[in-house]
Amino acid sequence: MPLLRAEWWEAHQPLVVFMWIILLVVPFAIVYGAGDTFETVLECIVNDYLTFIVLLFGLFCVSGNITVGGDFAGSPRVNACLLALGTLLSSCIGTTGASMLMVRPVIKMNSWRKRKRHIMVFFIFLISNMGGCLTPIGDPPLLMGFMRGVPFFWSMHLLPILIFNLVILLFVFYHLDKKAYRKDIAQGRKPDISRPGTEFYIEGLHNIIFLIMIVGAVILSGVLPGMSAFQDAAGNVRGIRLYGEVTLTLPALIEIVIILLAAFLSFKTTDSSIRTKNHFTWGAIKEVAVLFIGIFITMQPALMLLKSVGPNLGISEPYQMFWATGALSSFLDNTPTYLVFLTTAGTLGLTGGITTALGQIPVNLLEAISCGAVFMGANTYIGNAPNFMVKAISDENGVNMPSFFGYILWSLAFLVPVFILDMLVFFL
């Protein structure tokens, strides 16, 4: 709908999302009963959506209070360096954090250009997705793996695969951008640089403290549940029971409070002129909040089906895990998809590899599942949370981004061939 009638969608977005939720909830309630349906929806909102949107909100606020300026213009060389930097940064502060921190500077440096949609598409490929594969901080699926016994630094095993993909995609990007850059120059477009040179400055740099607070909150959410102080006598994580078995856990509550505090302090300590320079508005986060609550709720039946049949799918080889996890992560939330196939791998009864709470998982299977979940979230706008956020901010700032299906064509053209190479080189 937002692709067919954008103005109508903006005016009626909450109503449309609510309609789709009702279309799912009513049949679900008829089959399973109102009580179970309410519990399922509430559990989805409390345990998945709430921490998800609070994290996005916090990163959106803090990154919006940091602005980068100077004499750098969006040339192919500068853009390639920015993408490489952002890709590596994603594993340090998360794909969402890196995306929100880098998206406005990249857009600003390329504001003089006409042909720039490819820049933001590759931004999503690399910074919003692939770059998050090296640590549990990078992407939520890896954080879930860490919470279930995968060592914190194990995901550094994925560095050769990341470098392999990064080199290929940056090579392709550089030549695409070089061609577009020459066309822009030929049409008389020039970067808006007042003085030649390499002057560079960052305003609102103190917000890095609040960014670190948010990253720390995410790490705590993975560490605290394993501590005895946060467990009851039965070994369950302590929390506030809301309805039935639905509980807002204390670690999740602590994470939410820290993130909201970081966002509040960021706004209180940063001059509003910085947000003005960033063309900061609430439009992008509002759209993501409304759209993703619909996605989270309406994907529950598919995830329930996947959980019930996952161990019986006959998937046991690394290349099968890579494609199965990746294909479903493209359209469902990659975190539960990762957990389903991680559980499947743990039930195969294989020996050797990593000892987790789900069983022994061979390294090659764990690599395939991790790469499938993290890398293939880039296949669609809804595959990973930062994707749609980057699209929304880009649209707000005058970048003509591809439509939903148009973006899929980009991923089919540039990502799928890389994934085929990944399979041939690493997973066969």
Where is each model-derived feature located?
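Hydrophobic core segments of alpha-helical transmembrane domains in multi-pass membrane transport
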Residues: 1, 20-31, 56-64, 163-175, ...
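Transmembrane alpha-helix boundary signature
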Residues: 3-7, 25-48, 57-74, 88-101, ...
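Interfacial loop-to-helix junctions that mark the boundaries of transmembrane helices
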Residues: 8-17, 38-50, 152-161, 197-202, ...
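Membrane-interfacial helix-loop connectors
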Residues: 27-29, 90, 101-114, 119-121, ...
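Juxtamembrane and boundary regions of transmembrane helices in multi-pass small-molecule transporters
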Residues: 115, 134-135, 153-202, 375-428
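Core mid-bundle transmembrane helix pairs that form the ion/substrate translocation pathway
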Residues: 155-269, 425
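Transmembrane helical segments that form the transport core of multi-pass membrane transport proteins
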Residues: 213-348
